[in-house]
């Protein structure tokens, strides 16, 4: 298991982000018409990004193509192909961008707009950039990978993970914590 924590300078962060992610200008999103299950919207999508639903036993049930404006629902699996990129914006203003060959599951998202209280927990494989919204100002967002848990409060983090390693770059914010998962055998 390999865990790597990076703290980037402002200039190297700008260079890294500009190389990896598409700059989104003028993306307007309306959150007023969300049902109880809808927690966000796809703000930008490049090539094939899918929303996959698995039942409680893990059996695949449904796959939908994600396009700009697509409503994000909790517990769905958002996946990109080898050329895919997508940016999602949650109703508290949290934005996350996933790179090629990546997968994110929004396990838990609770948000009270009156108090800005709530929490966010997700699973991620591949490349993810998270910009915390109102929920992460008070409570850390949790990003679970196969080998570590990354907590980020009030900031921006880039996480790159696969089955053997997780790298987390703390770009900006209040705090980031990376906790390696222990082997169950010892």
Predicted regions and their residues:
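Bacterial N-terminal signal peptides that target proteins for export
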Residues: 3-21
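Flexible, surface-exposed loop/linker segments and immediately adjacent secondary-structure boundaries
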Residues: 33-186
């Amino acid at each position: 298991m390999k865990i790597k924590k990076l703290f980037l300078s402002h200039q190297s962060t700008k260079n890294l982000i500009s190389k990896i992610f598409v700059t989104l200008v003028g993306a307007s999103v309306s959150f007023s018409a969300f049902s109880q299950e809808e927690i966000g919207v796809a703000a930008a999508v490049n090539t094939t990004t899918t929303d996959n639903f698995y039942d409680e036993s893990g059996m695949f049930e449904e796959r939908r193509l994600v396009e700009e404006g697509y409503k994000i629902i909790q517990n769905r699996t958002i996946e990109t192909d080898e050329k895919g990129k997508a940016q999602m914006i949650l109703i508290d203003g949290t934005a996350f961008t996933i790179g090629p060959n990546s997968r994110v599951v929004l396990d838990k998202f609770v948000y009270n707009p009156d108090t800005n209280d709530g929490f966010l927990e997700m699973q991620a494989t591949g490349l993810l950039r998270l910009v915390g919204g109102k929920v992460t100002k008070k409570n850390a967002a949790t990003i679970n990978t196969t080998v570590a848990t990354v907590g980020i409060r009030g900031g921006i983090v880039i996480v790159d993970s696969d089955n053997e390693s997780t790298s987390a770059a703390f770009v900006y914010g209040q705090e980031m914590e990376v906790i390696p998962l222990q082997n169950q055998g010892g």
